[in-house]
C-alpha cells in the first residue's frame, strides 16, 4: 500500500528559525500484512508543538526527547482510527492515540504503544485529545496544581505568558477554576487579547508588541504577581519576574522564545533578575509533565468534566492536509495560532 509521509528534510541549525521547507512529503510503501500485536491505523489528526523545535537539532538538549533523523519520518502527538488489527485489545473502528504517532496518512503500529480513547469524553471532538483533553491540558492542569501553590480565597494573581497558545489558554482558565482571584494573560495581538478577556474569562491581557510590558503589567497586576505560568522565557519573563511577590511561584512550562537559541534548558536568568528571584524566594523549578503519569487518568477526567460543564473553553487552529505539517509548525512557532494548532489529515465519517 502506498501512503504519504513527512520526513525531516533539513535542520534549521541550532540558532536558526525553523521553516516549512525543513520538512518534505514523500510516498512510502506500507507492508501488506500485519504481524501479531500490530494494528493498521488511518491518521485523523496530528499535533505540532513547541517542544518539536528541540527535536530538529542533532542534540535535543534533553534526556527525554530523541532527535528526528534526516530523511526519516517525523512524529508527535496523533490520533487515528484502527482499520485492521492483530492486537488482542484493539478492534477495527477503535479510536487510538499516541505521543509518538508518525506523520503519515496511514501507519502500521505496535498496538501496545497505543491508547484507546472514548469519543464521549470530548463530545465527539477527537482532536481535543491532542489539546485540552490531552497532553497540553494535562501539562497545564498538573503544572498549576503541582507548582502553582494556589489556595482558594487567598487573593492570588496569576500571569500567563503565551496566553493564547495551547497550554496558556488552558492554564489561565484552570488558575481561575482552582482559586486565583485575578488572571492576566500576555500575548502578541489585540485579537488575542480580546479573545482572552471576552471568551476565556481572563481579567486583563497585555499585548507585548505594543507599549511597555512592565508598565502594562503594573497596571494589570496592582497587587504584584503570585503565580507565573511561563511559556516563553526571555525579556517577557524577566519583566514578569521583576514584579513577583515574595514567596511566589514560577511554573516553568516552556521557553518558546529561546528554543532556537543554543542555551541550556531552563535558560539561566540574567544576573539582576536572578538576584530578584533569590531575594524574594521565588521558586523556579523545572516542570516535566511525564514525571506525573500517575495523575494523567484523574487529570483527563477532570478536564473532560470542566469542558462538558462549559467551565473550560477550548480553542483550536486547524490546518488541513499532511502537506501542510511544515507550514502549521512554522506558523505555531511564530504565534500564528490561537489555542491548539492541529492538522487534520483525514476526516472520520463514523463519528
From Swiss-Prot:
Q: Name one GO biological process term.
A: prostaglandin metabolic process
Q: Spell out the InterPro entries in the cross-references.
A: ADH-like_C, ADH_N_2, GroES-like_sf, MDR_fam, NAD(P)-bd_dom_sf, PTGR2
Q: Which Pfam families match?
A: ADH_N_2, ADH_zinc_N
Enumerate the residues binding NADP(+).
165-168, 192, 208, 231, 253-259, 287-289, 337
Keyword Cytoplasm in record: yes
The organism's superkingdom is given as Eukaryota
As recorded in UniProt, its EC number(s) are: 1.3.1.48
Indicate whether Oxidoreductase appears among the record's keywords: yes
Tissue distribution is: Widely expressed with highest levels in adipose tissues.
Per UniProt, the keywords (alphabetical) are: Cytoplasm, Lipid metabolism, NADP, Oxidoreductase
Record localization: Cytoplasm
Q: What does this protein do?
A: Functions as 15-oxo-prostaglandin 13-reductase and acts on 15-keto-PGE1, 15-keto-PGE2, 15-keto-PGE1-alpha and 15-keto-PGE2-alpha with highest activity towards 15-keto-PGE2. Overexpression represses transcriptional activity of PPARG and inhibits adipocyte differentiation.
Q: Which family does it belong to?
A: Belongs to the NADP-dependent oxidoreductase L4BD family.
Entry-linked PANTHER family: PROSTAGLANDIN REDUCTASE, PROSTAGLANDIN REDUCTASE 2
Name of this chain's protein: Prostaglandin reductase 2
Which species?
Answer: Mus musculus (Mouse)
